């Protein structure tokens, strides 16, 4: 039996927009055009992507480090930006910057990787720019992950898995920005893996979904 849990929440009022649409688009275009493809077999483009991300993090005033992801075909790198206190609990927000490839009719093809996941990286870099204007009281770590897509998906060789295994500070909250760039307001544009979910959730793909483990106990600050 499958049970769907629909939390009782109220919509929050709109807040002023501070992120730059122009910068979001600039990042997506750079990743999907200038350094395309960003698949595992295109290490030069992945390294150029990592350098671009690193430069934005540095310009935001973060403490920036590169973390080696020691897997075959590398070197792949996670780019880590720290804000706020250097010890104590962490809030981690991450997004992978590689893109997928596949074989179609025995031909290797590369996805542009715009929604998956240049959009997540663009959001991550805008968070970096916004954090430049803040002084967080809790440590915040922004991480651009390498090696999320196959052949590394769901393995210990994922960049996110390597990063998680290296953490020594307690993690209060982790948010992964994944495919946040696609929008469709047409009726029926949103479907779900289980038909019953359509009874609980909108039929238009004009929202960003927040999914989490139901047992999460950390309170969220609005």
Residue map of PLM features:
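A non-catalytic alpha/beta surface segment that caps or lines the substrate-entry region
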Residues: 29-88
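Extracytoplasmic/secreted proteins, especially bacterial periplasmic and envelope-associated proteins
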Residues: 23-26, 30, 44, 48-59, ...
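Solvent-exposed loop/turn segments at secondary-structure junctions
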Residues: 70-72, 85-87, 97-101, 147-151, ...
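Acidic/histidine-rich, surface-exposed loop or edge segments in extracytoplasmic proteins
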Residues: 11-12, 27-39, 144, 201-207
């Amino acid at each position: 039996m499958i049970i769907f849990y629909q939390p009782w929440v109220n919509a929050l009022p709109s807040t002023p927009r501070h992120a730059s649409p122009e910068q979001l688009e600039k990042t997506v275009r750079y990743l999907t055009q200038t350094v395309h493809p960003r698949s595992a077999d295109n290490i030069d483009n992945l390294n150029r992507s990592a350098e671009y991300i690193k430069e934005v993090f540095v310009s935001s005033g973060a403490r920036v480090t590169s973390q080696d992801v020691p897997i075959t075909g590398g070197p792949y790198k996670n780019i880590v930006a720290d804000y706020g206190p250097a010890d104590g609990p962490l809030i981690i927000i991450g997004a992978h910057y590689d893109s997928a490839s596949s074989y179609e009719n025995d031909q290797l093809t590369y996805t542009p990787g715009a929604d998956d996941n240049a959009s997540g990286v663009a959001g991550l870099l805008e968070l970096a720019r916004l954090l430049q204007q803040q002084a967080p009281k809790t440590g915040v770590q922004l991480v651009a992950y390498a090696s999320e897509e196959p052949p590394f998906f769901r393995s210990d060789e994922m960049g996110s898995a390597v990063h998680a295994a290296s953490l020594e500070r307690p993690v209060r909250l982790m948010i992964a920005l994944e495919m946040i760039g696609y929008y469709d307001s047409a009726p029926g544009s949103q479907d779900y893996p289980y038909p019953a979910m359509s009874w609980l959730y909108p039929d238009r793909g004009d929202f960003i979904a927040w999914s989490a483990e139901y047992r999460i106990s950390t309170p969220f600050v609005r």
